[in-house]
Amino acid sequence: MAEAGTGFLEQLKSCIVWSWTYLWTLWFFIMLFLVYILRVPLKINDNLTTVSMFLNTLTPKFYVALTGTSSLISGLILIFEWWYFRKYGTSFIEQVSVSHLRPLLGGVDNSAPSAANAANGEADSSRQSVSECKVWRNPLNLFRGAEYNRYTWVTGREPLTYYDMNLSAQDHQTFFTCDTDHLRPADAIMQKAWRERNPQARISAAHEALELNECATAYILLAEEEATTIVEAEKLFKQALKAGEGCYRRSQQLQHHGAQYEAQHRRDTNVLVYIKRRLAMCARKLGRTREAVKMMRDLMKEFPLLSMFNIHENLLEALLELQAYADVQAVLAKYDDISLPKSATICYTAALLKARAVSDKFSPEAASRRGLSTAEMNAVEAIHRAVEFNPHVPKYLLEMKSLILPPEHILKRGDSEAIAYAFFHLQHWKRVEGALNLLHCTWEGTFRMIPYPLEKGHLFYPYPICTETADRELLPSFHEVSVYPKKELPFFILFTAGLCSFTAMLALLTHQFPELMGVFAKAFLSTLFAPLNFVMEKVESILPSSLWHQLTRI
């Protein structure tokens, strides 16, 4: 019974809401009807005659001034709209109308879900947004002292942003510190050093820690920031490895004695893995690629659970340098799995391997005549898959945009990830004959399959909206961030541009041909009001004249 009463009240409420929604239409027609009936008492005809006489006495200069002023005002609105769009990526008029005017006009969805469902939906969308905008450590990040600082010395530009370096400082504190560091003087000094913003202060603290003890993290800091060459960095990392292995063995024996010992062992494990990975990267940069591959494989076997370092991406790049494509395919078979997070390295390496099988004989003219073979179709689909995951990469691989030094952190599917991938893998694409030609001929076809990438994807989730904002914080200001999808001009910018141009043209024509424009304006107004006059004549002919006479006497 209660449910029936509640349902009746809901129906009654919806009927009232519906009636109020459309009541303004009825009110509008009633007002028009009353104005027409009371046109004689209100002397509307006399007033219209007076207004028309006033307009006839106006000179063409008035119309020139009127249209010129309208053009000026619409031009100012256009300039403001364009500035607001360039700065905030949206139209000011649209934002105000949606945020403030729509609620006042009753623009509320009556079919909205319940409050609980709405709260759950907001929570799900926020979790998805956080996941999409997660920033990852760049697996192939360069050395600050030996590479980033050398770039600054030569060009005078800072390749790293403060936001990027701050994220690295947080990573160092997470990987290289633990709660028991205050018990060891050298580790206590390094705990403060990782939080220090000044590079010279960090380096001085590392030297101070080494005076007290053979501290592995102090060697890491010096290898990353003080060493000016890769050779110097490798020497320091070897010293760090010697100290780190000793700490790792000691903490491994004590890890089951309590939570503090377990945390210390976890920290020592992170330190050891980081050192070995950087040593492998040093060997790769110094040309000892086979040695680097062996070190990476051993590291992945010894610590299979530490996938957060993404060592397999370092391994893929080194194997491509050796042109060991069978080994690359074996690594992809393990990591290009639907349950594992994707990356540009995985998607584009898979596309490169499939393109390699057909690219040397591929010809767009021949393909258009005979159609694509099965192998060519597989290669094109792999390229489309890679482009859907990260649409920024092809511009760098095809050298349509200039590369910069990759940041220390990347946003997956963003411009920062595209730079990091292309910086190291462009040479591998160039080495495969015809691969870049195949990419050039096919990559734009991806966008025809996903016309609305922000709303619906094809093989992946819709493209995240947050990439542009995050990439602007990760990449230096001198780099022009790649934006996808390309933003279209808002309607109101186009409208104000058209209005400004139209009124300016009217002002010019009125000034040059005043009589002709006057005739044109009268003809336009008479044509505009012709349907209304026709309707009123029909209404007067249908209704009896006595009724009109009685209504006008009210």
From Swiss-Prot:
Membrane topology designation: Multi-pass membrane protein
InterPro entries per UniProt: ST7 (IPR007311)
UniProt KW keywords: Membrane, Transmembrane, Transmembrane helix
GO cellular component, one term: membrane
Major localization listed first in the record, in broad terms: membrane
Top-level lineage group: Eukaryota
The keyword Membrane is assigned to this record: yes
Keyword hit for Lyase: no
Similarity annotation: Belongs to the ST7 family.
Protein's UniProt name: Suppressor of tumorigenicity 7 protein homolog
Gene: ST7
